[in-house]
Design a protein with these regions (language model features):
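Intrinsically disordered, low-complexity proline-rich regions
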Residues: 33-41
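Bacterial signal peptide processing site
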Residues: 23-27
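Extracellular low-complexity, O-glycosylation-prone Ser/Thr/Pro/Gly-rich "stalks"
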Residues: 55, 61-63, 77, 87, ...
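Bacterial N-terminal signal peptides that target proteins for export
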Residues: 2-11
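Structured domain cores in non-transmembrane regions
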Residues: 40-46, 54-159
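C-terminal motif of bacterial Sec signal peptides marking the signal peptidase cleavage site
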Residues: 18-21
Length: 239
């Protein structure tokens, strides 16, 4: 009788043991944490920029390249920035290379002499619609420079090239006296904080007069005169 009376208790014990086995910590239904997707590799965008000096007697200072998404290096009729003034008066491009608007920048090596060319590579990640600006001083002048101002690159595909011609500009920061004391390339002063050009704004350059043309105090000869365009710029997207 006792055995028969204990059957319900035995059943309860078996059921309890079975249920406890279901919660032994090995829950195979636990959701797996998904692995994070790897970050995509950055898209490297590369350009080769070749600058040809088309003048007869004007060396170009170290060429400055800047990639940016907004802004311009200069505006006709407006004062030049100090960074541009330094390039136009002395060829010093250090300030221009680190402008706040620059997403990437590069500099040529040394002078690009008349009839010669220099190729510079500039790289940027994940941006295919940047603007390219280029600047260089016409070395034997008071404050003449040439370059590109915010040239859009969105339509330039890998393997394609564009060729553009650039004119000479006057930074409007130094009077065009052409005398030896004011032109660094002939032994005079380069950059000066004093702006003695009454216009104080960027304009198209009127050209060189020179001693051969009757300006007795000029340190320049007819060889340093120039016509537009003064440079040819070829932009190739290589990557």
């Amino acid at each position: 009788m006792n055995v028969l009376n204990n059957k319900p208790m035995l059943c309860l014990w078996v059921c309890a043991a079975s249920l406890s086995g279901c919660f032994d910590g090995n829950d195979n239904n636990t959701a797996m944490t998904p692995m994070p997707e790897p970050e995509p590799e950055p898209l490297m965008v590369s350009y080769e920029v070749t600058v040809d000096n088309l003048t007869q007697g004007q060396p170009l200072s170290p060429i400055t390249l800047i990639l940016h998404s907004e802004g311009t290096l200069w505006e006709i009729g407006q004062p030049a920035s100090v960074a541009l003034e330094k390039v136009a008066e002395s060829g010093d491009n250090e300030d221009l290379l680190v402008l706040d608007m620059a997403m990437a920048s590069a500099s040529g090596e040394g002078l690009t002499m008349p009839g010669n060319a220099q190729t510079i590579t500039i790289n940027i990640e994940d941006v295919t619609n940047a603007y390219l600006s280029v600047a260089a001083m016409l070395g034997k002048s008071n404050d003449a420079f040439t370059g590109l101002n915010a040239q859009g690159l969105a339509g330039l595909m890998v393997g394609e090239s564009w060729t553009l011609f650039t004119n000479a500009y006057d930074a409007g920061t130094e009077a065009n006296t052409e005398d030896m004391a004011s032109i660094g390339a002939v032994g005079g002063e380069g950059f000066s904080e004093v702006r003695d050009d009454a216009r104080n704004m960027v304009t198209m350059h009127p050209g060189i007069v020179s001693v051969d043309d009757g300006l007795a105090t000029s340190a320049l000869t007819q060889e340093q005169r120039f016509d537009n365009p003064v440079a040819r710029i070829r932009i190739t997207r290589t990557q």
